[in-house]
Amino acid sequence: LAGRPRSAEAARAQGGVRLAEADGRDEVIPLPVHPSIHDALAADEFDLIILAVKAYHTETAAREIREAGGEGVALLSMQNGVGNEEALGVILPASPILAGVITTPVEVRGPVHVKVSRPSFHVGLANAREKLPGNKGKLAGVAALLRDSGFAVTTYDDYRSMKWSKLLMNILANAQSAILGYTPAQIFADPRLGNLELRAWREALAVMRGQGVKPVAVGGYPLPLAAKGVQGLPLGLMRPIFARFIVGGRGEKMPSLYYDLHPQPRAHSEIDWLHGAVAREGARLGIPTPVNATFTRIMRALLRGEESVDAWAGQPERLLAAVVQHGVDGDMP
């Protein structure tokens, strides 16, 4: 395991990685943690590198792998958002690349201290480089390895369908939670805000269609059915269904983008790989994405300190007005 120096130091101090299970068990798993990718690759030989860094660190991690002589080792990209596999392919052209998604909600309690919020161990895998010799065999081998470790594994033919489907899950009640400081339950308790979430989904689905990408049932979630409902039924009918899904799935856990602004803005955010990716691809394809584009614009302004986080927190009317200004009907039907 390679992490930041403070993570390696914490692991040495406590004797490994601390894992708190959903059933109350809390144990330390003895595992060497290296302070850098270079140190990890120098210490041993590896058949597989699993990348679990935030999307904004993907290119840096890839360059470190290349500089440490790790090009050619198979990579499994488990990051949220879209675009990571493509970035890896540019920097590491000789490496087999697999795409992966996981739907297990976890809470980071501290350096190398993780709590499993809900014991749902589903992993999706797909080749991100079909034409590279040996990639198909790598996929089968990694799938078998994870199944032997207790994961329910599903393999997909199109990694883009898998990753964009996971994006649908990740964007739900995410940016609004960060901007307004609301829980997902609070967002869906307001019909106007709940409808905004479904509008963002409609935009993402339109962008997926424009790329020839279909939603798949990642982690067993009925995303294809949900997509049909969002596209074909009134939002007022779909909103309560999504409210139950998001509140039941997350529990008390706040979504990822919330922590990019609270308790204070961070230097980086995955907004550009989530809502920003929808807006960017929409612009490329000529597909309007006013809700996702507005979420992205506001998040960027808050992260850069151009606007105050406090000025947007608890201000749904201001957010709704910003979206309307970008071209969405004011009644949000």
Where are these regions (language model features)?
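NAD(P)-dependent Rossmann-like dehydrogenase/reductase catalytic/cofactor-binding core
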Residues: L198-P333
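Internal alpha-helical scaffold of NAD(P)-dependent oxidoreductase catalytic cores
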Residues: A10, E67-A68, V90-P96, P111-Y221
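Glycine-rich beta-alpha junction loops
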Residues: R6, V82, V101-V106, R129, ...
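Flavin (primarily FAD) cofactor-binding/catalytic cores of flavoenzymes
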Residues: G3, R63-I65, K138
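Conserved N-terminal Rossmann-fold NAD(P) cofactor-binding segment
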Residues: A2-F46, A277, E281
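Residues at the C-termini of beta-strands that transition into short coil/loop
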Residues: G3-P5, D23, P35-H38, Q79, ...
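Active-site-adjacent beta-strand anchor residues
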Residues: L1, L51-A52, M78, D157-D158, ...
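Rossmann-like NAD(P)(H) cofactor-binding subdomain of soluble oxidoreductases
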Residues: D26-V114, G124
